[in-house]
């Protein structure tokens, strides 16, 4: 309904501009303008659907990324995400393993 209202407002604005300046448009010009407006509305409607699809996928992939990072932290894998500066790491629980900081994990078991 909002798109129809936008199109109607745009057509009325076009009619007002044409009427105010006394510009005479031929039937072909009027038809071309109306067709262009209709094409742009159809394109906008298609893009709105694509936006919704991407937003849905982005939310699900963001959730997947969050779950993956939590799982990595629980397993003690390196996810500190910082570079060693003067041999120290600023993130709590991380140690310097040049050139990156790694999360402290369980000690290695001797074979």
Curated annotation (Swiss-Prot):
Explain the post-translational modification. Answer: Kalata-B7 is a cyclic peptide.
- Propeptide feature: residues: 29-75, 105-111
Task: Say where the cross-link Cyclopeptide (Gly-Asn) occurs.
Answer: 76-104
The positions making up the signal sequence are 1-28
Please, which domain of life does this record's source organism belong to? Eukaryota
Annotated GO biological process: defense response; killing of cells of another organism
The question of whether Signal is a record keyword is answered with: yes
What UniProt keywords are attached to this protein's entry?
Answer: Cytolysis, Disulfide bond, Hemolysis, Knottin, Plant defense, Signal
Which cysteines are cross-linked by disulfides? 80-94, 84-96, 89-101
Matching InterPro entries, A to Z? Cyclotide, Cyclotide_moebius_CS, Cyclotide_sf
Does Mitochondrion appear among the keywords? no
Summarize the protein's role. Probably participates in a plant defense mechanism. Has hemolytic activity.
Annotated domain remarks: The presence of a 'disulfide through disulfide knot' structurally defines this protein as a knottin.
Q: Which family does it belong to?
A: Belongs to the cyclotide family. Moebius subfamily.
Q: What name does this protein carry?
A: Kalata-B7
- State the organism named in the record: Oldenlandia affinis
Its organism's taxonomic lineage begins at: Eukaryota, Viridiplantae, Streptophyta, Embryophyta, Tracheophyta
